[in-house]
Amino acid sequence: DLLAGRKVVIFGLPGAYTGKCSTAHVPSFMRTADAFKQKGVDAVICLSVNDPFVMAAWSKDTGAGDAGIMMLGDASAEFTKGIGMDFDAPPVGFVSRSKRYSMLVDDGVVTILNEEGSPGECEISAGETLLATL
């Protein structure tokens, strides 16, 4: 279990290789990954409704893995739906995708949740915003 007995940052986003996800959200956590660790965070996890192969390639292409971010795919959207963070946008081909959010989880309990009002925004859920609340 990735969360038991640990302090973990999870940030969810609509999709690998998509605009804001690649240019704003992931980079915000790449910039702050070391600072989170200095504040006692055990892991920073990026979660997207994609398969693990896409997430591994995206990790390599963005350098997120080298920055210490664990890139996880929620291929069936089971976790995303389970926490109520799924949305559909059929005009752009998004079905059961993740809303954009960031959270701090302490021993399996969400202690901070920052959810964007729109998947095209990346301010409330950015790494710098979450870091400032710790």
Model-derived features with residue positions:
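Chalcogenol-based redox active-site neighborhoods
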Residues: 1-134
